[in-house]
Amino acid sequence: MEKKTHNYRYIEWKTPDEMHFSSLQWKSELNFIKDEHRFFEDMLKEYTLPILESQLFSRVKELIEQLNLSRKDLKLLENRVAQHINKLRELLENLDEQREGREYRKEHKEILNDFIHYSRQYKRLKRDIFEVVGKAIKQQKQKRLLA
Amino acid sequence: MNRNTSKPFSANEKEIERLLKENRRWKERLTFFKEEITFLNLYLSAEIFQKDVPNLYERLQLFYDDLQNIKLECLDLTTQVHNHRYDIEGILECEDISCEVFYHQEHLKLKQKVQDFAKKFRKFKSEIYSYTGPLLRRTSNEP
């Protein structure tokens, strides 16, 4: 999907404290997604019998690959957020604050953009997982009723 | 705590548009939560867990009951967000500042409610993942 770049002009008004708070929120959200990745991967890999029976196997394989890609993207974003958090500490001690502050805000906007883009992509992947696993569960239930 | 960018609110069309945009974002978020709730409903009642796990069904039932409450809360919040849209549009018709301030405060309160709900739901999902994840039936090991 094409990545739209927004300007997020309101970042100009954010205080360092507010930017720091946003960065911590990104970090916490990414941590949660990491756990969720593990859960979905377990579900897709372990819950194989009904998936094989429902003939959704190739679709599931694709989803596992997408999960792997999503995990790699998450790692990159996580590193950038961690560096961004550390940079703020350095920035507050730096004398050349004005120029550094501009750069920091620019970076904050870039990460915000990428974070939003990542979240959208991840939501789509989750929707696909819900659809496929949901189908397999429903088919399994129907089979049990008919058996 | 509300950490909104501390720019004073003034009721002009640009600001109203910003509030409406925020309102749309909450709506999208809640719609996605509803999809997650539907999936978790199906997941918790599926026969995909290992057999002979002590208290498994009791635990699943507790999760299921909590999920029904979360679902109701989500629906209620969706209605509030939907209705709040008309309040935002009405701000331009306010005749004094206290009226504008009142609706803006309501906006911030609702924002906090959506954030609190998201946090609570995330915690609940984490509990489901960590309890049920290891209990998924391993096809290779179990008939």
Task: List PLM regions with ranges.
Chain B
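Charge-rich amphipathic alpha-helical interaction elements
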Residues: 1-143
